[in-house]
Amino acid sequence: MAQNETSAASPALIAGLAVESTAWQFLLNALKQEEQALVDGEADLLPKLNALKMAQLQTLNNLVRTRYNGLLAVGLTPDLAGMETWLAQQGKPEHHALWDALQAMEQQAQAMNQRIGVLIELRLSSTRQALNVLVQAAKSQGGMYDQAGCAVTSNRGKPLTAA
């Protein structure tokens, strides 16, 4: 590939890395909010945060695709090896630092997502246990509730017309 083509693609790749960095920060903020909502038991916030998180993931996906296309444009493979080669060709420590920061943010997001998964599983388990306790209590007392929340007694005893 000609040097001028590589040089022309470099500013776009560098600018893309800066935009990716901002997008990762937004995703990390959304994950922090989601984690805190789970810790605080604020389930009503989760749908909004999930929508925000999904939008950020789509943005990141688009940015990564753009970066891959930029690497292809300069004759490199669209992967980690291609990125490392491009960074080596640039020879600028600030570009390496930006790339390292992006990789660190990705690892941080993965770790946060795993913690969120554990918190969700804990909440679901706690809810299942509470539901089981309520169902067992209702069964043992012979009482159940209808859709309106009114007590419904079972017909296990003698009919009222029996002597």
PLM feature spans:
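Short terminal interaction segments
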Residues: 86-163
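Extended, charge-rich alpha-helical scaffolding segments
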Residues: 2-87, 96-97
